[in-house]
Amino acid sequence: MFRTWFGLNGLCKLPWNDVVPEDNKNTKEPAKVTGHVEKYARFFSAVTGRKTTPDDIILMSERVYNFQRIFNLRMGFGTRQHDTLPYRAVGPVTKEEYESRAERYGKQLKEKVGYETEGKSTEEKMASLRKFREAEYERLKDAVYARRGWNANGVPTLGKVKSLGIDYSDVVELLKTKG
């Protein structure tokens, strides 16, 4: 969620992501680089005069992220069907591509899918791998939507927008009709 906040404030996220303080390994949650997050909260507090904590930054980001999703919904987008990957990203796309990495793809089919590749055509293997990967992506969307407080169609729930304080009458009406 921090990425949204960085963009809203015109800040570069590189120092936060790429420069890890030496003492970071001694923090309670080293993967989060909490020292940087705390500094950004202090920075925001100093600029705005409003006391801000790292949790406040997350909440600001979450509000905007959900509001952007709602705006997309209003524009005819912002649902599960729009959360897709390009065909190319699920690959392999061509027979040649599959065959150039046949060992790798064959191993994935056997270990992850439980698909026996012996005697199968390249096209059959490609179709099986694609079907598996697309199903995995659907599972990922389910997990992301649940974590964000959205419904199975990828739309923020009324409960979510109320908890974020963005339950404006037009937002509620939109979610009731399209959510």
Model-inferred region functions:
Residues 1-179:
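Extended C-terminal regions of large enzymes
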